[in-house]
Structure formats: structure tokens, C-alpha cells
């Protein structure tokens, strides 16, 4: 440690270019501009959003399935009750699945619709197959982790007694983020600013 700082040079556009990650690498290595693929991974299959069985109210529901390697794919096929898809030579290796994406993904899409989101998540997590819920906002703020982390803050606002807003994700040990005051009304602090900061007397204000 030198005890000396240094200047950090970072542009917003640079971060966007860096976030291209595998897509950027694909282009730089091959010289080919990748086409649109929605939320599907260009280099890994299956790695995308799938519709699952509807919610109790009949609305559509989804999860993301992120099978990162051949071992995880075999485990997924076991969980899905389709071990034959793990043994099918068209789908054994990831490079095969990428090549045959057009036939495999529709098969998986139908399989995924046979079970609910909670059922899939529990089974896949138990098998250590990467996956994740796609939640609406009601589900986000009902999530036990979101609640335990205090991601909803309550404000006493003149126009709404209990105003709930999204809290700061920063949890600072020594100087925690304060939420003592709600966003001010238009002109709420005009007199205070003119009087205390600019020295205007009541008559001038």
C-alpha cells in the first residue's frame, strides 16, 4: 500500500461496450454481427426465459432457465422427466444444442408449461440447475429477502400519511442512508432558504 490515490477514468459508453461481454467477443473473434435473439443466450442452450404453467389467477408466468453446461443439461432433463433428451445425439453437447436450437427449444417450451413456477424452481434448485423467477412488482416486494433487507421505506408525507417508496440498496455500516424527510412539496422550503441561507427578513420574503 502506498497511501496514494489515483485518477479513475471511466466513461458511461465504455461501460455499455464492456457489458456486451460474450456478444462483443463473438463479433471481435468472428467478424460476424450477431442477429437479434430476444432474451436467449447466443452461445448456450437452453439459456432463456420460458413460460410455465399459469398462476392461480390464470395469468401467465415465467422463469429463466440458465443451463450453463452439459452436466446441468443432463440434470435438467432428469428433473423434466425427459432423460431421452439428454441422450439424444442432437442435444448431448452444448455445441449440438446451439446448432439444433430450432428443434430443442420448442420441445422444452412445451415441457416447461406443464409445471408451475414454484414447482420448477424447487425442483431445479434441488438439482443444482441454475434458474430464476421472473416476478411482477407485487412478487418482488413480497419476497422475503427484499423485506428482510428493508428495501421499502416509509415516509410521513403531508399529502399521504404513510408514503412507501423504494429504499436505497446501499447499506453503509458507519453512515447509514437516512430517510428522515420525504421529497418536499413545490416551494415548501422557499421561506426557509430565503431567510436562513440568504438572510432575507420576513418583509422582504
What are these regions (language model features)?
Residues 26-34, 143-157:
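Short, surface-exposed loop/helix-turn segments at secondary-structure junctions
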Residues 156-204:
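Flexible, small-/acidic-enriched active-site or ligand-binding loops
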Residues 1-67, 74:
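Active-site-adjacent "lid/gating" segments in soluble enzymes
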Residues 46-127, 131:
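Aromatic-enriched alpha-helical interface/lid elements that frame and gate functional surfaces
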Residues 7, 41, 45, 67-71, ...:
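Conserved active-site and cofactor/substrate-binding residues in soluble primary-metabolism enzymes
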Residues 72-73, 120, 136, 142, ...:
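Residues within well-ordered alpha-helices
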Residues 125-146:
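Conserved PLP cofactor-binding pocket of PLP-dependent enzymes
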